[in-house]
Structure formats: structure tokens, C-alpha cells
């Protein structure tokens, strides 16, 4: 048997294809017409276009490989038994197998080259002397998490890919690593065959979908799976090649396992011939034991292909990631008083995730300064959001916040603690609504609503309420056109279903909430005939791969984490708080009254280990329920409050309140003793938060630290690793690790679900 192998980028050279262009003039003319330039001049004339530029390299190699193949078949009168290609060369292998003709293949390659040629800021390097497992271990050990394995060229030649700066860091690491014979940076502009090609892949996927492919006449070995292409997954597999590892070693081992196999390199150079020679010397063949049940084996093989496509980047909704320019379907929620800091938001954005700056409890100036800082750090297309917490008592503060967000062109808002849609949210949506060229209504000001109740979800899944539109029209705050367009779209682009979580919580259970909310979403989309899907995310309790996997299996289009981010370097809270959080376990939280909604009895989940806050906060709420005023408390209780809880007199507290609260509130307190008591008790909640954030030594036991069990689970997960110490925890690295290990876990669980019933079915062995 014989396999024809086709080289990829790196094999190009000036002068290649000489003689072939004249021999196949009709195809050369066809190529010139498709490309818009002379393919012969590109390949043979030094003063013409640069054949080493990706945009030109790929079409040039494809054409030369294709013409070389036609000449080989004419000369030998024989077609191959198998075909394979390295990266770009795979298109020639598919052409040889009859999947498409010369013209179609060239159009695909032209588009691929254009997309990859636009990628900048990336780098690649070959590591000689280490196995893939050893290379991966070195990357993990030195926290080079932004680097991927791009090519497995031979057992001892591994190509890595990632941001150029990260590749430069890796050079120093590998050159000082035992057994590394050579670290060779490649002359490329992009991080090819890595997660950083995901956006280009999505565009290519849409492009390739318009083409029709014919049945394969011979098996073509896929770079992605190191196994033959499946006809019904041909387009998907070809697209996946762009951001996945080229498994060349295992591809050749698979072919070696077919029996006596001859390899012939078709195209310029002998790069693949050299790689195959080394693989034969350094590795053994792979084979499959004959299958007992072809139907079952085919099903299992298909499942394996599906599983192999599970990566950190593939989890969640592709449309969601595309809309927000994300690599990962991973968000980090806003945390009170800027604990979800500008540093946190920037770090996540640069890593292909999205964070929300926590505005609760901050002044407008503090929020605006943070927005300017974030915008100054991030470039176009890097996503960030601002958290907007509903203020039931002071809606005017929401008005001012929306004015600020609109003024600073903040286009993504996380709406938290809203019990329904409000006029300020309607106004925010109105100022970004328009029709695109296709006539679809789109909104540049996006809302992601965090919800935990179906009735709240329904209000955000519905168009803006008519009474609010009329009110805003009457106040000249929106236009007639804006009102008309708002009637066509939901109030929220996406909703995030929040199960039991740190901070404000309804104590919901994800297993019950997610199915109910996704069904409601489907019902509302049908009711209002929305054209664009509303995505449903999951939050609350997510701190381990198991929890994240459960969320995605329940249908989450994205996940949102909270508590685990509070115990990181980027969190804007005190080291003392982080020290306490690092020690907590899943049972170390409790529920306490929410300071901002004290009178209603709303709850927040807080840390209880090492502090008295939850017990003291609950005591205050108990007193508020039992008594009508501070004066009704006995002397002993008053003394306890002043000495143990407040560390100051009731009189001093009230003076402080009078300085900071609106005059209307103080006037009401003077007339209503119950309201005055509520203001005094609520002072303790602000006080306890400030103690924690500042790390005050004055009264550590009064620290109010919003937190859920997810952090306890996270602590157990990373116990014994570098991440056990919070000083080694960075939000971006945590996010990537969580998503990566979730993908691995999901892959393993899928494998176990589809494990063959016969030991001889589809088992890879060495021979």
C-alpha cells in the first residue's frame, strides 16, 4: 500500500513548481483568475509577491502540491491507497481523495490564507528533544498557560504556539530544561493551530458551509484526530484543524499500523519524508483489533470524534462567544465596592474572558475613574462590563449611573438584584437600538440580567413594558423610533441563572432552576418570535470542574463565577480577608440579612468561619422585628450593641448617618422611630464591609465577607498545588484552568458513557 503525503507551510521555496505551470496551463490560468495574481510569478520570481507571507504561501503550496499530484498520477498510473497532509497539505489530500476539485480547494485555501494572514501578535517555536507530555509538563510547571501545543511533528519534535511575548518567555525556560536539544522560533506572524485561531475558525466555518463536498474515494487521515475523515463531519473536521493540534506523529503511526506501507511526499521539498523517517525510528505503529460489531464500532468512533472536539474554547455557545469577542464562555460577576476591580476586569478581558466591574457602594466619580482606566488598558474588541445593582430606595442613583454609562459608551451591563425591568434599563437599551442592513433590530447596549426567579426572568425575556415606553416618551427621554424598535426585542440579550451564591441569594438549586429557565426562554422566544437566540448562563456554586461540567450539561451557554475570584491577587479586598477565605471549606458560610435591603429580610451568604458577623447581623434583624424603636431596647442590650457590635455610641452613629444620608431619610427617621432604628442597624453593615475591605485590625470578628460554598470547593480542589496559596491565584489563570479541566472531565465522562461492551471493540494497541 502507498500513502501520498502533502507538505504544508514551511516547505515553500522560490522556484517551486517550475515546469508544472506550463504543463497544466489551464489550471494555472484558473488559479490566476481565482487569486487575482500570477501564481507562476509568485512561485518563481523573487521580485514578485512574497511567497513567505501566509496569504500567498498557502495558495502557492496548494497549487504546486496539486499539480505535482496530477503529474505523479499521470507518470505512475496509480492513485494512493491513503492520503494525508500536514496542515495546509490536508486540503491537497482531500482533493486527491475526490472531496472537491482543484478550483474549490483553491478557493478554500485562499480564504484560509487570508484569515490566517491577518493574525498578528503570535509566535510559534519548535522544541526538539522532549515528548509532548514533557513539553506540556514544562509549560504547566512554569505557568505558561497561554501557550498551546500546535504540532506533534515527531515524538521528539513538538511545536508550541501562543502570544509572541509568551513564546519569548518559553525560550528561556526550555533552553535551560534538561534534554532540550534545540528551541527554534518559527518565522510566523500568528499563533497558528492554537486557541487564538478560534475567531478565524468561526469565520472560515461559515464560509466553508456554502460548498458541497463529494464522497471520499480513499481514506484521508485527519490532522485533528489522527484517524480517517468521516464523510458527514468533513466540513467540521476541516474547520477544527485551524485551532487544533496537528497530530502528525499519530497520523503516521496509524498508517504504519495498516500493514506494509510506503510513503511518497508530493510537493516541494522533503520535510515530511524526514519527519516520517524519525517517526518510524522513534515510535511504534498503531492498529485496531478487528471490530466485532461494525454498527456499534461506527457509533463509538463517531462519539470519540465528538469527544476529541471538546476543548476549553469549545464549551458553551459559539454565538455567545462571537457576539462578545470571547475565547471562553466564561464570565466573572461584579462584586460590591469594586472588589471585582479594574485590574480583574482587564486581566480577564486580555485572556479572552469577560469580567464586570463592581460598582455597588462606590461613588459616581470612583466608577467613572475605573471605567476610564479599563478603557485605557483595553483595545477594540476586548470585552468588559459594568455591574449595575438595583437600588430600590434610591432610583435616582440608578438614573445617574445610567447617564454615566451612556456618557462613557459602556456597552455591556450586568443587571443584578432587579425584581423587574425598570425605566432606567429601558432607557439604556433605547439609546443603542437600531436596524441593521438586513432589517434586523439590534442593540449595541447589551444587558445580561442575573436572575433567580421565573417571574423576574419573564420580565427580562419580554420586550420593554408598554407603560414604561409611554412614560419615557412623555418625558422626552426616548424617541418614537426607539420605542418602536424596543417592542421587537427582549429587554435582556442574555440571562444568567443564579443559584445559591455568595452575597445576595434566593438559595436556589441549579438542578431545578436551569431546566425551568431554559424552558421559559424557549417559550418566550416562541411567543414574541425573536429572531436571535437569548442565551442562558449559569452562576452560583461554580468553583470546580465538576460544578462547571454540570452547568454545561444542564444547558448553560456560559458560566459566571463569583466567590472564587474574591480570593485572588486582583481582588480589591484586604489580604486579611483573603487569608480567611483561603482557609474556608464548603460548610463555612451562613446567611445574614442584606444591609441594603435590611427591612425586607433579604439574605446574603457570608463567611462564618473566624468571624461573628453573621450571628450579630441576624441578632440585629431579630431586634428590628421585635421592637418598634431603639428606645424599647433594655440597657443591657444597648450596652452590648455599643460596646461589642458598634464600638461607638448610638448617638455618634446617628450623627454619622445624618451627615451621609439624604435629608428626606433623616426627616423620616425623626418622625418614624422604627425607620430610625433601621438606619442605625444598617450602619453596622456598611461598617463591617469597610472593616473587611480595609483589613482593619480594629475588629476582625466583625468582617462582613460575602462568599458562597464554591470557594470552599475550589480550595479543596487546589489543595496541595501552587494555587493553595491565594498569592498564586490570578483570575485569568483560574478561569483557564477551570475551563480546561472541565473540558477534560467532560471528555472522560463522555468516554465512560460510550465505553465499548466488548473489550476487543476499537482498542488502540502497540504492535
UniProtKB/Swiss-Prot annotation:
Pathway(s) per entry: Antibiotic biosynthesis; bacillaene biosynthesis
One annotated GO biological process: fatty acid biosynthetic process
GO cellular component: cytosol
Recorded GO MF terms: [acyl-carrier-protein] S-malonyltransferase activity
Subcellular location: Cytoplasm
Class in the EC hierarchy, top level: transferase
The protein's Enzyme Commission number: 2.3.1.39
Catalytic residues (UniProt): 87, 193
One matching Pfam family: NMO
Main location group: cytoplasm
Protein name according to UniProt: Polyketide biosynthesis protein PksE
Source lineage: Bacteria, Bacillati, Bacillota, Bacilli, Bacillales
Amino acid at each position: 500500500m502507498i500513502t501520498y503525503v502533502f507538505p504544508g507551510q514551511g516547505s515553500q521555496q522560490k522556484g517551486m513548481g517550475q515546469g508544472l505551470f506550463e504543463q497544466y496551463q489551464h489550471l494555472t490560468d484558473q488559479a490566476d483568475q481565482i487569486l487575482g495574481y500570477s501564481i507562476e510569478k509568485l512561485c518563481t520570481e523573487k521580485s514578485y509577491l512574497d511567497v513567505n507571507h501566509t496569504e500567498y504561501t498557502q495558495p502557492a503550496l496548494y497549487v504546486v502540491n496539486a499539480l505535482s499530484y496530477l503529474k505523479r498520477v499521470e507518470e505512475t498510473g496509480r492513485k494512493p491507497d491513503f492520503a494525508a497532509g500536514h496542515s495546509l497539505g490536508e486540503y491537497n489530500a482531500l482533493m486527491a481523495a475526490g472531496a472537491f476539485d482543484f478550483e474549490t480547494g483553491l478557493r478554500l485555501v485562499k480564504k484560509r490564507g487570508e484569515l490566517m494572514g491577518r493574525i498578528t501578535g503570535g509566535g510559534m517555536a519548535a522544541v526538539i528533544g522532549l515528548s509532548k507530555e514533557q513539553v506540556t509538563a514544562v509549560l504547566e510547571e512554569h505557568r505558561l498557560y497561554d501557550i498551546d501545543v500546535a504540532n506533534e511533528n515527531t515524538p521528539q519534535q513538538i511545536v508550541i504556539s501562543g502570544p509572541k511575548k509568551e513564546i519569548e518567555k518559553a525560550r528561556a525556560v526550555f533552553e535551560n530544561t534538561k534534554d532540550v536539544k534545540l528551541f527554534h522560533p518559527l518565522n510566523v506572524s500568528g499563533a497558528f493551530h492554537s486557541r487564538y485561531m478560534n475567531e478565524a475558525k468561526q469565520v472560515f466555518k461559515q464560509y466553508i458551509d456554502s460548498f458541497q463536498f463529494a464522497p471520499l474515494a480513499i481514506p484521508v487521515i485527519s490532522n485533528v484526530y489522527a484517524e480517517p475523515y468521516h464523510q458527514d463531519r468533513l466540513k467540521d473536521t476541516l474547520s477544527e484543524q485551524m485551532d487544533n493540534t496537528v497530530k502528525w506523529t499519530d497520523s503516521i503511526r496509524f498508517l504504519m499500523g495498516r500493514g506494509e506501507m510506503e510513503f511518497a511526499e508530493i510537493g516541494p521539498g522533503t520535510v515530511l519524508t524526514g519527519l516520517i523517517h524519525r517517526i518510524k525510528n522513534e515510535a511504534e505503529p498503531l492498529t485496531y483489533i478487528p471490530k466485532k460489531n461494525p454498527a456499534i464500532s461506527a457509533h463509538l468512533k463517531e462519539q470519540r470524534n465528538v469527544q476529541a472536539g471538546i476543548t476549553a474554547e469549545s464549551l458553551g455557545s459559539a454565538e455567545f462567544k462571537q457576539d462578545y469577542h470571547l475565547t471562553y464562555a466564561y464570565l466573572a460577576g461584579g462584586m460590591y465596592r469594586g472588589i471585582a476591580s479594574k485590574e480583574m476586569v482587564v486581566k480577564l478581558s486580555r485572556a479572552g474572558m469577560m469580567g464586570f466591574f463592581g460598582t455597588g457602594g462606590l461613588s459616581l466619580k470612583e466608577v467613572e475613574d475605573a471605567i476610564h482606566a479599563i478603557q485605557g488598558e483595553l483595545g477594540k474588541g476586548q470585552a468588559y462590563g459594568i455591574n449595575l445593582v438595583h437600588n430600590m430606595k434610591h432610583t435616582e442613583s440608578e438614573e445617574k449611573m445610567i447617564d454615566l454609562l451612556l456618557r462613557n459608551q459602556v456597552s455591556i451591563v450586568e443587571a443584578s438584584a432587579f425584581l423587574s425591568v425598570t425605566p432606567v434599563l429601558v432607557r439604556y437599551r433605547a439609546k443603542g437600538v437600531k436596524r441593521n442592513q438586513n432589517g434586523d433590530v439590534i442593540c449595541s447596549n447589551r444587558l445580561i440580567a442575573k436572575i433567580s426567579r421565573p417571574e423576574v426572568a419573564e420580565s427580562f425575556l419580554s420586550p420593554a413594558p408598554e407603560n414604561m415606553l409611554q412614560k419615557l416618551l412623555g418625558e422626552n427621554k426616548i424617541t418614537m423610533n426607539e420605542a418602536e424598535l424596543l417592542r421587537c426585542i427582549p429587554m435582556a440579550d442574555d440571562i444568567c441563572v443564579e443559584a445559591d451564591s455568595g452575597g445576595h441569594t434566593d438559595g436556589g438549586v441549579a438542578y431545578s432552576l436551569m431546566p425551568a429557565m431554559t424552558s421559559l426562554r424557549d417559550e418566550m422566544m416562541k411567543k414574541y418570535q425573536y429572531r436571535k437566540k437569548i442565551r442562558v448562563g449559569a452562576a452560583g456554586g461554580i468553583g470546580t470542574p465538576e460544578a462547571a461540567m454540570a452547568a454545561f450539561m444542564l444547558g448553560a451557554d456560559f458560566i459566571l463565577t463569583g466567590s472564587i475570584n474574591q480570593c485572588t491577587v486582583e481582588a480589591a479586598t484586604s489580604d486579611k480577608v483573603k487569608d480567611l477565605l483561603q482557609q474556608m471549606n464548603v460548610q463555612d458560610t451562613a446567611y445574614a440579612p442584606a444591609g441594603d435591603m435590611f427591612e425586607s429580610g433579604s439574605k446574603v451568604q457570608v463567611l462564618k468561619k473566624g468571624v461573628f458577623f453573621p450571628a450579630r447581623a441576624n441578632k440585629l434583624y431579630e431586634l428590628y422585628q421585635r421592637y418598634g424603636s431603639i428606645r424599647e431596647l433594655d440597657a443591657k442590650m444597648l450596652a452590648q450593641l455599643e460596646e461589642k457590635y458598634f464600638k461607638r455610641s448610638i448617638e455618634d452613629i446617628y450623627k454619622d448617618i445624618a451627615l451621609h444620608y439624604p435629608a428626606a431619610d433623616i426627616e423620616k427617621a425623626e418622625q418614624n422611630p422604627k425607620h430610625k432604628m433601621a438606619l442605625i442597624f444598617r450602619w453596622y453593615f456598611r461598617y463591617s464591609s469597610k472593616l473587611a475591605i480595609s483589613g482593619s485590625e480594629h475588629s476582625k470578628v466583625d468582617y462582613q465577607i460575602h462568599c458562597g460554598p464554591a470557594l470552599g470547593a475550589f480550595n479543596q480542589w487546589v489543595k496541595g498545588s501552587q494555587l493553595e496559596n491565594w498569592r498564586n491565584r490570578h483570575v485569568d489563570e483560574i478561569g483557564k484552568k477551570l475551563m480546561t479541566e472541565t473540558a477534560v472531565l467532560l471528555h472522560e465522562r463522555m468516554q465512560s458513557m460510550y465505553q465499548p461492551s466488548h473489550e476487543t471493540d476499537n482498542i488502540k494497541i502497540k504492535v
